[in-house]
Amino acid sequence: MSLLQSALDFLAGPGSLGGASGRDQSDFVGQTVELGELRLRVRRVLAEGGFAFVYEAQDVGSGREYALKRLLSNEEEKNRAIIQEVCFMKKLSGHPNIVQFCSAASIGKEESDTGQAEFLLLTELCKGQLVEFLKKMESRGPLSCDTVLKIFYQTCRAVQHMHRQKPPIIHRDLKVENLLLSNQGTIKLCDFGSATTISHYPDYSWSAQRRALVEEEITRNTTPMYRTPEIIDLYSNFPIGEKQDIWALGCILYLLCFRQHPFEDGAKLRIVNGKYSIPPHDTQYTVFHSLIRAMLQVNPEERLSIAEVVHQLQEIAAARNVNPKSPITELLEQNGGYGSATLSRGPPPPVGPAGSGYSGGLALAEYDQPYGGFLDILRGGTERLFTNLKDTSSKVIQSVANYAKGDLDISYITSRIAVMSFPAEGVESALKNNIEDVRLFLDSKHPGHYAVYNLSPRTYRPSRFHNRVSECGWAARRAPHLHTLYNICRNMHAWLRQDHKNVCVVHCMDGRAASAVAVCSFLCFCRLFSTAEAAVYMFSMKRCPPGIWPSHKRYIEYMCDMVAEEPITPHSKPILVRAVVMTPVPLFSKQRSGCRPFCEVYVGDERVASTSQEYDKMRDFKIEDGKAVIPLGVTVQGDVLIVIYHARSTLGGRLQAKMASMKMFQIQFHTGFVPRNATTVKFAKYDLDACDIQEKYPDLFQVNLEVEVEPRDRPSREAPPWENSSMRGLNPKILFSSREEQQDILSKFGKPELPRQPGSTAQYDAGAGSPEAEPTDSDSPPSSSADASRFLHTLDWQEEKEAETGAENASSKESESALMEDRDESEVSDEGGSPISSEGQEPRADPEPPGLAAGLVQQDLVFEVETPAVLPEPVPQEDGVDLLGLHSEVGAGPAVPPQACKAPSSNTDLLSCLLGPPEAASQGPPEDLLSEDPLLLASPAPPLSVQSTPRGGPPAAADPFGPLLPSSGNNSQPCSNPDLFGEFLNSDSVTVPPSFPSAHSAPPPSCSADFLHLGDLPGEPSKMTASSSNPDLLGGWAAWTETAASAVAPTPATEGPLFSPGGQPAPCGSQASWTKSQNPDPFADLGDLSSGLQGSPAGFPPGGFIPKTATTPKGSSSWQTSRPPAQGASWPPQAKPPPKACTQPRPNYASNFSVIGAREERGVRAPSFAQKPKVSENDFEDLLSNQGFSSRSDKKGPKTIAEMRKQDLAKDTDPLKLKLLDWIEGKERNIRALLSTLHTVLWDGESRWTPVGMADLVAPEQVKKHYRRAVLAVHPDKAAGQPYEQHAKMIFMELNDAWSEFENQGSRPLF
């Protein structure tokens, strides 16, 4: 029987009930359905959609035919949508151009056989879709202008009826497939499943989350080809209302006239920009051209209203003497008189779209052959059968091709920037990008010219992409650190500059938020856009909506500010956050009456403050309070994250002093962009990250940070990458492969940019002065510390080869050089000359231009020739004097002869050598005038000592205090200033200390004299760190214990003119390695007074390094390597570290490593006299006792934070509860631990309990036995009326909770 059934199914027509497609609905066919007074017999299936089926039903009494729509729903949301559709149809029914509503009914899922709620919708039966009739007429030529006029006019009449309702009903899914042809030949509009009365008015206050929700809802109810620009681009902030139906009507009119859709492929960019074309040689439909243009306006406010459209159509009809309301009989006549033969069948059917259950409409073949089956084959059905087989095969092939094409999730933002999701391995690769497929794709399309940037915390083997992977991820649900984001942009820019074929491939986990932040920042970094909205918009169009948070957009705006025409450089001033104020009080309590907030503050990845306390000690703010204030009083600098939580008390948490926390929101910003005179930083509701549901935040909710910007700069531990970088030369053309591509992108996305939305930048209130944000570049010399950040362990930067980058201090370059040396040996690429190492380093730089190399040779000649120092001619002074040199900044410039000293500016820098590093003079703003290759600047090279240049002015005046510090240049004398005290601090006039590498010094001036004969002492100026507030007064103290053997040591073979570690001559434009300590310790060297008391001579360590010694008169670079440079290497090679010394190393106060490298990189440090004596804690007790201090610390006081908390808790806590808390500490719900220590918490006089050890509680049976014994011993019923009754209750509760946890975990044995 089953074989016969299968044969019948095969022979059945595609629309019949015997096929597989109709088997699920066959039980409904043939049944009798009662809807009110009508008894209907279901005859056959007309169509089926996503969750609805359309049947032909006949009234048993009158024989009239209807269309019965059966909708199935298993979700409450679908139920509401179906009910809304029924309501709209009832409201709109009666119009001649809208499908007539007859009746409706529903049953719940409990009564339904399908297990889903069922809805029945009865409407008139129509002949079929208009599109089917139009297809029949295609072979006969285009439609006449009068036919188009009648079809479109009747459609607009239906839409006008919808828009006249109160409130207006928006169809939202107008398309030619939803236009039916009635029995009488009139147009009928159907499918109101997507209709709505809600309009949206986006503005700058909308958050990204709100936009995403609206976009998702609209996308679910619209068709791609008919979507409007304001729907696709919600960031345009155009209103979304009735005018979206006008756009769809324009598409329908275009389709009726020219037989093709204006946006056939549904391309978003073409729709957003309104890029369509009317055939230039069309003369038949000229009367409609202006109407099409007026309806397809990108700005919805410029489109015609439906009343204006109908009015223009009436004028056209009057001019052509046509009645637009008359039936369109020409369609029925040209289709063989199909309509007249069946007019007695009754009203035509409604047809629903996919959104409401029916997607395709009623096919004409189903009317021609309503009962397909075996007779179809005899009447030519064989042809249709094989046609269907062919169509099915082609669809299968197309779906397989689409799957293969879409299997690789990669999108090109430009031809040189690609974004993809995480390249997965193993089982995960079946769902995501397979890493092998990604590699094959990139190798075939960009062989040897792509670099991968991994922004996710997960990693994979870099060898999969030929060791060209940069690991630069950051924590999830946060914005990246500003220096990390800047370094990524700079590295991508350097990689794209090296070769016009190079591309950057960026990925995070899903290729959305994190990738969008990096890519959009890079687009702004290259000055393609000047606002974050424009960059995010391009990313959304090219890939997908990124779903970024306000803090993400805020950091993209930071990048825009830093590369603007008037750049804003983040200042280095700390900020005191006094309090966090929330107004009004957010509603996070269970009663929605207020909140109990506490705050956590993070600087970078480190938590620096928390206001969390015991639940009862934190204030509960109510709505009546008006605002919630959290006092902080914490000083922060850099990337700051403030997280606000709501504290909730949990059941049983009172006993264990625990509570639950619920995140309310978080804020992330960089302190360098807070104006100096700001007192309040305001964040509106749309500026907050990680927000909860909107009902918990009252209207006009905002968060204010009460801040105070400290007047002095605080040097950072590492020099920020933007410190002296020049933004000249940044051009968006680097993002594109051709000029045509650039012009195409500019034509699509280069529209006038909107002003910034307030979601990306906070508002500031100033206490005094101008409320506008001042320039945020630092007033004092920034830090030049040599710490290498964690990011530089995976990304090593090389500056561009143009004159566009500012000078960087030599110490940071030396540390980067050390990092690059570490990587050079381990870098092995399977492609020759791969630009990035296995740890994801910077690509190699191209060879220098000949002109640049020649310029560097000339610079080296300055160091090769020994010339006596020539005093410059006196120069006239100008009036304004900068006595403290606060306007100087670190810069490097070309070496100039002494006579080249020009007249100084009005600011005379008198203390430049005391408060800032020695600098080279420049003729203009501080720029890299020599355009050195970063390879030559990889190690500290000695600049000539010329006065520092004030910002934006000519060289500074003479420095009368310059001789107080060691000589730092070839011409050691400042202009017209004798070195009066040079011998006090210099061991020799020609000896250059390690921390101040320079060319050989000139003879001392005649007026200089070593009055105290201290010149023979081996100095150690490397200890003298510059600081504006705390100078290192004892910087050279340890020089007494150092050996002077190195002062006369022979020069290594590599020494001559200046050499960098790579073996190449170092240019003079690099700066001296003078670091500024963040917290200088003037007594840092006291512990090393006797570091070398054995008198053994100091020798040179292996590797050519000279530790802590002064260079020879001919010495150039203080640190050198004897290893020859690798051929074609982009980084200097690394010298192997020497064996470690046995002596105790000096204390290191740097956070990561020293400016001049780690101890193993500098070699063995030979002791001079003797080892350091060990200092005990009582060595200074006599000094302390004489001054009235106790010689010994108080041993009774708390030593840990936990002990301090216990003491604080003991002040207002019941001693009994305190004893119990001590017992359960670290043993919460651990039955074995509680039983083994139960004897420590029992009351006095309890003798029934015998202590047990952990060895007696191994097996579950043993635990159960001793638990029962413990319960019998401490049961509260046995302690009734006793003074220890409450004590017994608390012990019993803890044991009971622990036993329940033990059973829930399966009563597992201990081993």
From Swiss-Prot:
Residues 709-729, 749-788, 801-860, 913-1035, 1047-1150 are annotated as: Disordered. This is Cyclin-G-associated kinase. Ubiquitous. Highest in testis. The keyword Lipid biosynthesis does not apply. Gene3D superfamilies: 2.60.40.1110, DnaJ domain (1.10.287.110), Protein tyrosine phosphatase superfamily (3.90.190.10), Transferase(Phosphotransferase) domain 1 (1.10.510.10). The modification Phosphoserine is found at residues 2, 16, 456, 770, 783, 811, 826, 829, 834, 939, 1096, 1176, 1185. Belongs to the protein kinase superfamily. Ser/Thr protein kinase family. It is found in: Cytoplasm, Perinuclear region; Golgi apparatus, trans-Golgi network; Cell junction, Focal adhesion; Cytoplasmic vesicle, Clathrin-coated vesicle. Keywords: Acetylation, ATP-binding, Cell cycle, Cell junction, Cytoplasm, Cytoplasmic vesicle, Golgi apparatus, Kinase, Methylation, Nucleotide-binding, Phosphoprotein, Serine/threonine-protein kinase, Transferase.
